[in-house]
């Protein structure tokens, strides 16, 4: 019975080991490891040996995953299962040592990674098995004051938290000897460094900022060359001044900064860090910083800010610039005015930030430089050492070259002084037939495209060439030898004045003399020695003296006498047409349309009756026209007064279509015209009978 119970218990213990070291790529749960440790710690020695055998058998498994889990179980249980299990593992440590050079089959997916994990875990297990018992006792309950620690490298060295004296907190007092003594005292409590000068690995300290670049000696500190060849930045604030110092003083002050940080540096580290989501500090954080900084030493705060501006991390420099900008905006304060003066004399760090490839850092640095320069944005051009040469402005070529000079003032001066153009200007676009007469023009007569009325002249005496003179320079016939030197030919004026043409020889033929050979008066054309040319202005003009004065009548001069030289044709109206002659009226109306006046109409009817009574007196004119049927202009050749009425009895003219009078209204037939027709018929019949 006892044997069966022991067998069941043994099987149950083996199942516990198999569950922790299963061939699955999963980490064994910690609570199962704790159950095994509790069982080993409270069991008999025989049961502990049985557990050890089960675990060592799992080391012989072919799977590298099982081997690694068995080694991890041994490593974990050695420190928590008591001394009996440790002694058993020490007796059988050969099985663990054989896995130092384990080389199994490479995994198709992970390759040799699993085999390498077995080798590394074997080394760690041997180290845990043969470690001192005092260091491997079960962990006592942790005190509340102990800080939280995580897993990491075993070579991690916690930086010692040295107690700082009161003198290390004092800033701005004492002499250089006191500070040198403080630095020597601080050096004695520093952890020892390697003799070769390289510092050992120091992990992050959770009590301080993760971005403190001055925690070790290998921090970034750019070298600055002074005028005297010395280098380094002066951190000595004893005399209240700043400037360049020697390299030894820089190193000693750097050692003081490493050991004992001032209140200003501590305050600055609370806001100037590289961590965090925000690139710039919040407004509330800056407000709290300004309130605290107003109570501190401005010189030490300036030096601390200058150190942050030399940080290798651009995030730290960005936040330092934000803090400096907030301080500069409060420069009315006496304490912050010292910071303004300090950075006005030390612009190197800010100008280096202005040259950063980070756009946000560059913009912030330029803004700080503008505040330092009194609100004027200087950027990179503020320092003589970092001046950037501006590229010379390249004049673009004139793509639309009109030939005009860009210097309009010179053109105006040339016009005022009356200077002449030495060379011929380009021909205007409208001057197709331009000649060489334009070369002699002065600059005062120069045309410009800006003045559309430059060529318009309201004085007939000015001799100025028109811009639209398409026929300037064209001559028809021979040129006169007496042409003026600079006379510009005018447009062809058919109806204009020809005073100049009368002075030409009589045999000259001119384009202006189109009507020269036409004659209206037959006698004038047959006289000897008479000129064969008629001036254009006299073509339709009235003569100065007439042998017969036409009486005035309200009909518009239709019944009046016609002037000599006028074409005697019934298609043209007689006399002078009134000013209100309508546009749609025909050329041969009985009288022109006028506003209706009934008094005048009564007199007109009386004149018509008189006109019809005198019709019989004109029979002889009809006989004369019948004899000279081929001559239209036969009347009035004797030089006397011509007939005042149209030749209505001319038989050679075709019948005229009835004309419209009074604005197109059709004239009604009357008995008076029927009487005229009957009278003419009877007169012709009488002539035939006789």
From Swiss-Prot:
One of the protein's GO biological processes: clathrin-coated vesicle cargo loading
Superkingdom field: Eukaryota
Annotated spans, Disordered: 228-258, 518-551
InterPro entries: ARM-type_fold (IPR016024), ENTH (IPR013809), ENTH/VHS_tepsin (IPR035802), ENTH_VHS (IPR008942), TEPSIN (IPR039273), VHS_dom (IPR002014)
Comp. bias regions, Low complexity: 243-257
Compartments, record wording: Golgi apparatus, trans-Golgi network; Cytoplasmic vesicle, Clathrin-coated vesicle
An example Gene Ontology molecular-function term: phosphatidylinositol binding
Pfam family, one: ENTH
Any one of the GO CC terms: trans-Golgi network
Residues covered by the VHS domain: 20-150
Disruption phenotype: Abnormal vacuolar trafficking of soluble cargo proteins, and premature termination of the shoot apical meristem and of floral meristems. Plant missing both AGD5 and MTV1 are severely dwarfed, develop short siliques, exhibit abscission defect, and have altered subcellular distribution of clathrin-coated vesicle (CCV) cargo exported from the trans-Golgi network (TGN).
SUPFAM superfamilies named among the record's database cross-references: ARM repeat
Keyword Transmembrane tagged: no
Family annotation (PANTHER family): AP-4 COMPLEX ACCESSORY SUBUNIT TEPSIN
Function: Mediates clathrin-dependent trafficking of vacuolar cargo from the trans-Golgi network (TGN). Promotes plant growth.
Subunit note: Binds to clathrin heavy chain.
Name the UniProt record assigns to this protein: Protein MODIFIED TRANSPORT TO THE VACUOLE 1
Organism classification: Eukaryota, Viridiplantae, Streptophyta, Embryophyta, Tracheophyta
Gene: MTV1
């Amino acid at each position: 019975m006892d044997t069966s119970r022991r067998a069941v218990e043994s099987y149950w213990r083996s199942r516990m080991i198999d569950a922790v070291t299963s061939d699955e790529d999963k980490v064994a749960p910690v609570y199962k490891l704790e159950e095994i440790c509790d069982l080993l710690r409270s069991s008999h020695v025989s049961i502990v040996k049985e557990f050890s055998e089960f675990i060592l058998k799992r080391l012989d498994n072919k799977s590298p995953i099982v081997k690694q889990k068995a080694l991890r179980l041994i490593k974990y249980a050695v420190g928590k299962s008591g001394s009996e299990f440790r002694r058993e593992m020490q007796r059988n440590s050969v099985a663990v040592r054989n896995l130092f050079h384990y080389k199994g089959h490479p995994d198709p997916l992970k390759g040799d990674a699993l085999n390498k994990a077995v080798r590394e875990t074997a080394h760690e297990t041997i180290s845990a098995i043969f470690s001192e018992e005092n260091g491997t006792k079960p962990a006592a309950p942790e005190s509340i004051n102990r800080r939280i620690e995580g897993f990491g490298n075993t070579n991690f060295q916690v930086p010692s938290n040295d107690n700082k004296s009161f003198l290390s907190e004092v800033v701005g007092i004492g002499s250089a000897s006191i500070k040198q003594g403080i630095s020597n005292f601080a050096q004695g409590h520093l952890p020892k460094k390697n003799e070769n000068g390289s510092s050992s690995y120091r992990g992050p300290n959770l009590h301080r900022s993760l971005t403190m670049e001055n925690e070790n000696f290998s921090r970034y500190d750019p070298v600055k060359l002074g005028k005297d060849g010395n280098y380094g930045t002066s951190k000595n604030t004893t005399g209240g001044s700043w400037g360049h110092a020697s390299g030894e003083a820089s190193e000693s002050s750097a050692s003081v900064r490493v050991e004992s940080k001032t209140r200003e540096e501590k305050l600055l580290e609370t806001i100037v860090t590289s961590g965090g989501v925000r690139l710039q500090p919040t407004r509330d954080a800056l407000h709290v910083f300004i309130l605290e900084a107003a109570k501190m030493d401005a010189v030490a705060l300036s030096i601390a800010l200058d150190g942050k501006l030399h940080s290798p991390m651009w995030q730290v420099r960005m936040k330092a610039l934000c803090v400096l900008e907030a301080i500069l905006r409060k420069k009315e304060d006496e304490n912050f005015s010292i910071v303004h003066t300090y950075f006005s004399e030390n612009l190197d760090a800010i100008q280096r930030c202005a040259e950063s490839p980070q756009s946000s850092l560059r913009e912030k640095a330029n803004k700080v430089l503008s505040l330092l320069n009194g609100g004027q944005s200087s950027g990179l051009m503020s320092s003589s050492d970092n001046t950037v040469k501006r590229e010379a402005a390249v004049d673009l070529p004139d793509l639309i070259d009109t030939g005009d000079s860009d210097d309009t003032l010179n053109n105006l001066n040339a016009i005022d002084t009356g200077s002449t153009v030495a060379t011929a200007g380009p021909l205007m676009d409208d001057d197709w037939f331009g000649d060489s007469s334009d070369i002699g023009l002065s600059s005062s007569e120069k045309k410009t495209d800006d003045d559309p009325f430059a060529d318009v002249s309201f004085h007939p005496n000015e001799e100025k060439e028109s811009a639209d003179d398409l026929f300037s320079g064209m001559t028809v016939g021979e040129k006169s030898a007496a042409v003026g030197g600079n006379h510009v030919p005018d447009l062809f004026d058919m109806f204009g004045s020809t005073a100049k043409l009368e002075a030409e020889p009589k045999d000259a033929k001119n384009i202006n003399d189109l009507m020269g050979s036409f004659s209206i008066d037959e006698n004038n054309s047959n006289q000897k020695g008479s000129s064969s040319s008629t001036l254009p202005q006299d073509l339709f003009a009235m003569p100065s003296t007439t042998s017969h004065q036409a009486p005035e009548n309200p009909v518009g001069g239709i019944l009046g006498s016609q002037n000599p030289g006028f074409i005697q044709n019934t298609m043209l109206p007689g006399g002078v047409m009134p000013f209100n002659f309508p546009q749609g009226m025909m050329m041969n109306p009985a009288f022109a349309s006028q506003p209706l006046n009934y008094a005048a109409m009564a007199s007109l009817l009386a004149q018509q009756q008189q006109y019809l009574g005198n019709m019989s007196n004109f029979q002889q004119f009809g006989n004369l026209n019948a004899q000279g049927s081929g001559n239209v202009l036969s009347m009035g050749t004797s030089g006397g007064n011509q007939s005042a009425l149209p030749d209505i009895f001319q038989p050679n003219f075709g019948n005229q279509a009835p004309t419209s009078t009074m604005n197109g209204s059709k004239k009604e037939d009357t008995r008076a015209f029927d009487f005229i027709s009957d009278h003419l018929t009877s007169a012709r019949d009488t002539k035939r009978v006789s």
